[in-house]
Amino acid sequence: METRSENVLEVCDLRTHFRTDDGLVKAVDGVSFTVKRGETLGIVGESGSGKSVTCLSAMRLVSKPPAFHPTGAIYFGDTNLLSLTEPEIQKLRGERLAMIFQDPLTSLNPYLTVARQLTEVLEVHQDARPAAARRTSIEMLERVGIPDADSRIDQYPHQFSGGMRQRVMIAMALLCGPEVLFADEPTTALDVTI
């Protein structure tokens, strides 16, 4: 029999509902799955079936209110993510749990350079010094196929094509080597080379 600690992620009867002016919306209604370390799980469904909300719920990124979880649990190892305080979940996000969002244009801050957005991840989660964080960020941009990464890192998101912005999002999600990576249509804007 498998134990909870054998699974890196276990979602049990997750329900994410939203209270709206038009009534209750059951975006996720009874989803369960497990992911073992090193395993890949694909969630497939029609548009609007709750795939993105499932990932956002697991990362604790749905706004409460209007969202709420009438039942369910999301275990990361032996820890139920739904029972954590906001500071506790923030310690896990970015370092041990990461997400590549569907739309990099709205996920990247247009007022900050790519360098600032990438290095902040390392400075916050790994106490990296600015120079080391910059070096690691440039290396990650190179790994995801951004040419001239050492100069492009100082540009703003609007100076990148859609595919290059998506590569920045992938680099950001991978920077800390997370144990669980949620990828919400991560290759929509990419060419086939990544």
Where are these regions (language model features)?
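A short, proline-enriched helix->beta-strand linker immediately N-terminal to the Walker B motif
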Residues: 175-179
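Conserved ABC transporter NBD signature motif
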Residues: 69-80
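The feature captures the beta-strand-to-loop junction immediately N-terminal to the Walker
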Residues: 44-45
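Hydrophobic anchor residue at the start of the ABC signature
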Residues: 118, 170, 194
